[in-house]
Amino acid sequence: MQVSVETTQGLGRRVTITVPAADVEKAVSSELVNVAKKVRIDGFRKGKVPMNVVKQRYGASVIQDVLSDLMQRNFINAIIEQKINPAGAPSYAPEQFKNGEDFTYSVEFEVYPEIELKDLESIEVEKPVVEVKDEDVDAMLETLRKQQANWKETEEAVGAEDRVTVDFNGSVDGEEFEGGKASDFVLAMGQGRMIPGFEEGIVGHKAGEEFTIDVNFPEDYHAENLKGKAAKFAITLKKVEQRELPEFNEEFIKRFGIADGTVDGLRAEVRKNMERELKNAVRNRIKSQVIDGLVKVNEIDVPAAIVDSEIDVLRRQSAQRFGGNEKQALELPRELFEEQAKRRVVVGLLLGEVISSNELKADEERVKALIEEMASAYEAPQEVIEFYGKNQELMNNVRNVALEEQAVEVLLGKAKVSEKETTFNELMNQNQMA
């Protein structure tokens, strides 16, 4: 077998393989013998069909099967011999086969990039220094009250935290636009759901009023035809509602599973949950900075085939979130996911190299701790722990998380780390925007 390897472009490779005629003939003859033992042809006993009849009836299909098998087996042998690491499915291109002659074919594919990590010491990380303070707990308790509030209609003017029901009709340069019109639209103020200026234009008005507000669509607005455009919205304010906060009493406290119904019990539970969230937020903030730095100082090419596979994964995940099916998932434009998919492939390859070059193995104590941490958010933690222990796929997922954390710690040990004091709210908001 003769093998030659050439680079087509970037990570593209073409392997050309020539199989000696004798090897092809031997494989075809062997397969014809196997076929002759199995086939039934009228006028002949099973296993007694003359070889010339078998060749006449089955020769062409046997040759096709043999060539297909030879191409795959010899390609695998060739990449092992040449120490090539292919990425994605190969594409076979056989030349025309002629009896008694050598058989030549080529295979095109991509390879994984050769990665040599560099400049790890230049990665900069700001480690958040933060704790859950009493005022953070107070604010969270007030948020819980707002979440449990009832809404009561009022004749007063709209306030910054009220809820309104409106009809609106938007126009740009006097022309209505898609998605710019709604009836009986319920809007909780202060949540930033609408474009800048929309909510502010409603504040101060009363139910029954009709008015127009002027706004500007942001330059980064998702609809291309509206980016940066000035718009007018005709508003009919149909209803204004204010929150009626529940009393901070035993009945309210017991809604959150606090058996003794005490303020101290609720504060302790809220603090525990906030500290768990904070721990995750700090960990995620550090991890995102480490990975951003790793990607910045280690630019690599990635195989298009692997990016395509990742795009398909993201398409399916997106379709599932919005109740779509497989067909609808594949119809989603690849442009929506291409940048994210490429980023995920780059990060995966770079972290894989960190893991490989440092010979990291998942720390089972860390795996156990991660499962216990996740389980602590449930009412029956032990049941969750046991469920994970019986599910090998879930256990492997947690091991991958642990291994990724270990890789991040290795990188963190080489990075320039500084500390920055922050608050609970600042850090949580940063993580939401990331």
Curated annotation (Swiss-Prot):
Enzyme Commission number(s) from the entry: 5.2.1.8
High-level lineage: Bacteria, Pseudomonadati, Pseudomonadota, Gammaproteobacteria, Enterobacterales
Localization (cell): Cytoplasm
SUPFAM superfamilies hit by this protein: FKBP-like (SSF54534), Triger factor/SurA peptide-binding domain-like (SSF109998), Trigger factor ribosome-binding domain (SSF102735)
One of the protein's GO biological processes: 'de novo' cotranslational protein folding
PROSITE patterns in alphabetical order: FKBP_PPIASE
Gene Ontology molecular functions: peptidyl-prolyl cis-trans isomerase activity; protein folding chaperone; ribosome binding
A GO cellular-component term linked to this record: cytoplasm
Species assigned in the record: Photorhabdus laumondii subsp. laumondii (strain DSM 15139 / CIP 105565 / TT01) (Photorhabdus luminescens subsp. laumondii)
Domain PPIase FKBP-type: 161-246
Pfam family, one: Trigger_N
Family (UniProt): Belongs to the FKBP-type PPIase family. Tig subfamily.
Main location (coarse class): cytoplasm
Domain notes: Consists of 3 domains; the N-terminus binds the ribosome, the middle domain has PPIase activity, while the C-terminus has intrinsic chaperone activity on its own.
Catalytic activity, reaction form: [protein]-peptidylproline (omega=180) = [protein]-peptidylproline (omega=0)
HAMAP family named in the record: Trigger_factor_Tig (MF_00303)
Protein name according to UniProt: Trigger factor
Function of the molecule: Involved in protein export. Acts as a chaperone by maintaining the newly synthesized protein in an open conformation. Functions as a peptidyl-prolyl cis-trans isomerase.
Record carries keyword Repressor: no
